[in-house]
Amino acid sequence: LCIVVLAAACASPDDGPDTRSARNAVQTAEFRRQGSDAGSFDPNWWAAFNDPVLSALVTQAQQANLDVRIAATRVLQARAGSTAAASRLAPTLGLNGSASDQRSGLPDAYKRTSPDTRALRTSLDLGWEIDVFGAARASADAADFDAQASAEAAEGARLLASSEVARLYFAWQGARLRQQQFEELLQMRLDTERLIRSREAQGLASRFDVARAAAETQSLAAQLPPLRTLVATTGHQISLLLGRSATQPLPMLDERVAPRLPEVPALPPGQPAELLARRPDLRAAERQLAAEGARVREARADLLPRFFLAALFGAQDLTVNSQALSPVRYSNVALAFSMPLFNAGRLRAAEDRATARERGSAMQYERAVLGAVQEVEDSLVALAQKRKRALALDALQSQ
């Protein structure tokens, strides 16, 4: 047995999955920089737009969004699981007690062989699994990494809710602005049509001019219902993100207030590795990979012996035939071990499954990193082109 234990302890573990390609993707990424390279990420990024309505909507979404609240409950669940797994590292202590009163009902002459007894017993039980090969520690580490991944996922849910509220709010303001512009244009068309009809009555315009003016008015009026629908549906989507029913109006989205689009502040992206490190989904994937690695260590430790320490300390008060005896103290200390010898390959299959899950998690992490690089690059390119388009439109209007 000692030879088996020493050989198992000296065995070198597998180095785990190869994530060098994912790390290289972070290190070699060269994002196109827009503006300054400096600056750290502001968690209250929406405040840079200086829009109190947007700030109020984002704050409410972070508190009331259902996805955010669901993620928060998962964090509580994962933390409870982490606490439960860590408890395996500590000994257990229990208090036991019992009282018994046994009467035979026989005459006193026969009570020598069947005496009446009354007993009071109390004891302390101590149990501890000595974590020689780290199975309990690996289980606790896996649960702790799961809790960290849940916390990162919750942060990602808050970030997603905030960004979606901001995007929909800007879309709502833009739709209202286009609606206002079309309504002003429609009023101008109506005035023009009335003027042309008046000129026709005076013989200064033809029926063709009237028909053309009416067609232009109707064409412009036909574009208003889709814009009004867009304003309404966008407001409904914002209500849903805030955990409200679409039938409940949002006082903050007051259509009587003139629409406006805020100025887009400069958003310095920072360094590539810093940009990716800000993403909660990547941090969650990395923590999940660490959890799977801990489960591999746990599965390998299950192939090795397990050692247990048990102790019992107690006291007993005994009365026999109404005669009290002296209190008795007793104790029992035992050291035990168990080692799997044959289980039809169950433990080895569990190790293989954990190893495969770790490799799959490493691939998912690599895919998430590469996808994040693409998303950031695409966003920066789109931002640069939209700014160029806005400058070109401003130059065209100034001519």
Which stretches of residues belong to each language-model region?
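Amphipathic alpha-helical coiled-coil segments
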Residues: 70-85, 157, 161-193, 198, 220-228, ...
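Terminal intrinsically disordered/low-complexity segments used for targeting and assembly
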Residues: 2-63, 120, 144, 228-277, ...
